[in-house]
């Protein structure tokens, strides 16, 4: 898959057809560029501590009622929601529109040690924090075997 669009006249591969070009665009419903940007714009950090997996998503301007946190297929954490569009007045004259609106969704496959039945989520100052506790790692039990003979 080509990540950078080639435009060099001297590049012998510039005009090759890329069969994967546009594959991911077909997975997202046809929307405006602004809505597509919102879909991909939910930035999420994932860190692992000794006790849990912690996800932090920047969702400025999104109310907690507009966000869903779910675990599906047993171990896939799904963070999704909707950024509401600002109401427009007929008399308004926009000079610049940079804030995106529309749907967003992020999915994360959780490791086997995740306690998916104890997931907690909170939202403060536009930052969603999802905490997934980890199961304690059982240390292998060593059993001494007596040697006969």
Swiss-Prot record:
**Keyword Cytoplasm found:** yes
Q: Signal sequence span per UniProt?
A: none
| Any Pfam family hit | HSP20
Q: Which GO terms describe its cellular component?
A: cytoplasm
GO MF term set: unfolded protein binding
Q: What induces it?
A: By heat shock.
List localization entries.
Answer: Cytoplasm
Q: Which PROSITE patterns match?
A: SHSP (PS01031)
The sHSP domain sits at: 35-149
GO BP term, example: response to salt stress
Keyword entries, A-Z:
Cytoplasm, Stress response
Decide whether keyword Cytoplasm is in the record.
Answer: yes
Q: Which family does it belong to?
A: Belongs to the small heat shock protein (HSP20) family.
Self-association state and partner proteins as the record states: May form oligomeric structures.
Entry protein name = 16.9 kDa class I heat shock protein 3
Gene name, per UniProt, is HSP16.9C
């Amino acid at each position: 898959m080509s990540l950078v669009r080639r435009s060099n006249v001297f590049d012998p591969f510039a005009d090759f057809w890329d069969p994967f070009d546009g594959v991911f665009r077909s997975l997202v419903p046809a929307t405006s560029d602004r809505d597509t940007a919102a879909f991909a714009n939910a930035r999420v950090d994932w860190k692992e501590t000794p006790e849990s997996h912690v996800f932090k998503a920047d969702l400025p301007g999104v109310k907690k009622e507009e966000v869903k946190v779910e675990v599906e297929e047993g171990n896939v954490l799904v963070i999704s929601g909707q950024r509401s569009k600002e109401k427009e007045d007929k008399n308004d004259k926009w000079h610049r529109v940079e804030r995106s609106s529309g749907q967003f969704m992020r999915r994360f496959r959780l490791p086997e040690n995740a306690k998916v039945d104890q997931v907690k989520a909170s939202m403060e100052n536009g930052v969603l924090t999802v905490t997934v506790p980890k199961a304690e790692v059982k240390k292998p039990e060593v059993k001494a075997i007596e040697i006969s003979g």
